[in-house]
């Protein structure tokens, strides 16, 4: 009673297929994949932008440990 058998999962799968249809499920998965891809791209853009902002503009002369 506490765990799901294979019959429970087959019934759930049948209901999902009836609700969404065969053609709609791949379309939904494609949209989810595009969303994840755009999210990762956005996170990568934020890291690049934050790395550029952390530079304070000072240069170090390697010959004489002097900061200009």
UniProtKB/Swiss-Prot annotation:
One of its GO terms (molecular function) is protein transmembrane transporter activity. Residues 53-68 have a biased composition (Basic and acidic residues). The chain crosses the membrane at residues 1-21. Keywords: Cell inner membrane, Cell membrane, Membrane, Protein transport, Translocation, Transmembrane, Transmembrane helix, Transport. Gene3D superfamilies: 1.20.5.3310. InterPro entries: TatA/B/E, TatA/E. GO terms for biological process: protein transport by the Tat complex. Residues 42-68 are annotated as: Disordered. It is found in: Cell inner membrane. It is a single-pass membrane protein. Part of the twin-arginine translocation (Tat) system that transports large folded proteins containing a characteristic twin-arginine motif in their signal peptide across membranes. TatA could form the protein-conducting channel of the Tat system. The Tat system comprises two distinct complexes: a TatABC complex, containing multiple copies of TatA, TatB and TatC subunits, and a separate TatA complex, containing only TatA subunits. Substrates initially bind to the TatABC complex, which probably triggers association of the separate TatA complex to form the active translocon. NCBIfam families: PRK00720.1 (NF001940), tatAE (TIGR01411). This is Sec-independent protein translocase protein TatA. The gene is tatA.
């Amino acid at each position: 009673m506490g765990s799901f058998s294979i019959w429970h999962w087959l019934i759930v799968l049948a209901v999902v297929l009836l609700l969404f249809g065969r053609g709609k499920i791949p379309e939904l998965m494609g949209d989810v994949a595009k969303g994840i891809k755009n999210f990762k791209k956005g996170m990568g853009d934020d890291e690049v932008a934050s790395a550029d902002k952390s530079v304070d503009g000072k240069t170090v002369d390697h010959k004489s440990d002097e900061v200009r």
